[in-house]
Amino acid sequence: MRKNRSAAVAAASFLLVTGAAIASAPSAYAGTPGGTHANDRNTDFNGDGYDDVLVGSPGAAVGGYKGAGMVTVQYGGPKGMGTTNVRAFSQNSSGVAGAAETGDNFGKAVATGDLDSDGYDDAVVGIPGEDIGAVSNAGGVVVLWGTPKGLTGSVSNWLQADDLTTSGRFGTALAAARFSDTTPGDLLAVMDSVGLTTYQFEPATEPGAKSVGPQSRQPQQKARTTLTSPPKTALARSGADEPPGIQPKSMTTGDYDNNGYADLIVSGTSVGDEPGHGWSYILPGTASNDEPLPVTAVRGGPVVASGDINGDGYDDLVTGEPHSPDDGGESMTGGMVGVYYGSSAGPAGQEGPGTPPVWWTQDSPGVPGTNERGDGFGTDLSVGDTNKDGFADLAIGVSGEDIGTVPDAGAFIVLRGAARGLTSTGALSANQGTTRVPGTVEKGDKFGGQVSFTDPNDDGRFGLLVSAPSENTNDGFVWVFSAGTGGITTSGSWSYGASAFGGPTADALYGAAIDD
């Protein structure tokens, strides 16, 4: 049973303004670390051992309010996921904090993690368009607690910025993992338009016991930092004298130095004299009694994902730059993806830490397609082992890909992992015109807008979810691709939208966010 669950922001020692790692001073809890490596899945809301799927539909009309937004959870099982064992939540659902309003965009961002260490993963939903009082688009976050029955929404926690600002968009991106040993649960990172806040929740009194619902409380302590100015204590990598400030866009987590604690990546695009370039800050996770490690910055972003591509036990960092200038800033490309391989010193480039990543484009040998302006190669990324060979594979969204003469129809590409790293051998590319893929190639669908590996039947082979949020004039659809001994296959693929479970469809943008 959960008792007296209150939220407290993790101590400020990890913040970029100090240049220290993610660690905090309170005495450590005993317990097995969870959620440290990228493949430590944390999407099991009912504790049955099967991954569940959390999908955001931020454009959904709820109670007549356009763009109020909703999320759905599809529960995994021996036969995988479907459209029958589904729950939908909005701010009009009983127990969910707030109320549905026009333009709230509930579900614009989603994340999962066991925040209270009770054995049931929890769902975190970003609401960046939330108006609070007279402050428009201040943003907010709702935590839906996992139970033996899954997500119930009977009680939820509400989080918001300490200092409300117009267009602050608190909840723009979310991530949860075990960054330190200050609590047995996962810490929650919440991004807004300029910075980052982390939250720590008290552990459940009786881990694994049947939940009767937590007490909903506001955070007791708060710590903040902005990222739009260069952190003075951050160490630059990848050929820059000083890392720039960034407009933060996304986050990912992984144990890149394999020290037993997750590291947090905050990614965005540069601001200042040379705007628009992708950069990512690495905030290392450490034990609370260890000397904090310095924050470092590497080229690449604003899209990021993590996983062990070469099977060496270190998570690797993958960055996507779908619309940014190339390294020289002289021309636009169709997008590029960078791979930093994990090491004892954290993510390392081609020649070790502090060097550029291994760059991939559609002009790289063996990669399907051709590098063309507007392709959006790297629109979204996901890393997972699709054939159970011990090497994680990389899914790449190419949402701006033209299919024949149809502009921006979209596609996805899967590159395989291997002992030597990412390889184009055995690469797969598919779109709505590919044999056995449901649907029709249409202008502006942006198929590949989201890609997410998931293993809802727990067979060790990660299938792939691919969304086209613009499908059917912004209604949105999600495609399900299974995995076999050869990895991802289009055989047996199927698709669904919000109508499959009676949800609102018009301009719903279903699949605009999928937890990864």
Walk through the language-model features, giving the residues of each.
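Mobile, glycine-rich extracellular loop/lid and propeptide segments
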Residues: 102-116, 120-130, 135-146, 158-160, ...
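Hydrophobic strand positions within the blades of repeat-based beta-sheet folds
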Residues: 53-55, 71-74, 89, 106, ...
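Acidic/hydrophobic-patterned starts of short beta strands in beta-sheet-rich repeat architectures
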Residues: 47-56, 117-128, 181-191, 258-267, ...
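Blade-edge motifs of beta-propeller repeat domains
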Residues: 2-9, 14-39, 75-105, 145-169, ...
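A detector of repeated loop/turn-to-beta-strand junctions in beta-rich toroidal repeat architectures
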Residues: 66-70, 83, 122, 135-140, ...
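Core solenoid repeat modules with strong leucine/isoleucine-rich periodicity
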Residues: 252, 259, 264, 303-307, ...
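Short glycine/acidic-enriched loop and turn motifs that connect beta-strands
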Residues: 59-64, 129-134, 194-196, 269-274, ...
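Beta-propeller blade termini
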Residues: 32-51, 56, 107-120, 171-181, ...
